[in-house]
Amino acid sequence: MFRTISRKNMSQKLSFLLLVFGLIWGLMLLHYTLQQPRRQSSVKLREQILDLSKRYVKALAEESRSTADVDSGASMAGYADLKRTIAVLLDDILQRLVKLESKVDYIVVNGSATNTTNGTNGNLVPVTTNKRTSVSGSVR
């Protein structure tokens, strides 16, 4: 008899502990979700990347103009190499952003498909298609 009472008591303690843990976890998740700064859309991020790269290239051009008296041939070759390197890096960043976007869209679509409450599963279409344009051609 004592064992059945202690089992119920342990079960209640464990249930209470799990309930408190779940409540704390839920509150922390809610707090984290509300306190996170809003994410910028990928289009804005792409525009910022391109704008910053243009400014950087302009700054390098001005710097190369100021040092053109010293060694114009080598600095211009270095400038062209640097410009190509930046273009390749920016293209790689944009490709990674597109891949990340497609993964997030896939997760969003599949996550919403598993959480249907009415039991009807319609045809699911990805949220976005591959909207990437060739930006690297305009940068190089």
Curated annotation (Swiss-Prot):
Residues 1-35 form the signal peptide. It comes from the Eukaryota. Glycans are attached at N110. The keyword Acyltransferase does not apply. Residues 118-140 are annotated as: Disordered. Residues 131-140 have a biased composition (Polar residues). It holds the Pfam family MGT5A_N. This is Coiled-coil domain-containing protein 126. It comes from Mus musculus. The lineage of its organism: Eukaryota, Metazoa, Chordata, Craniata, Vertebrata.
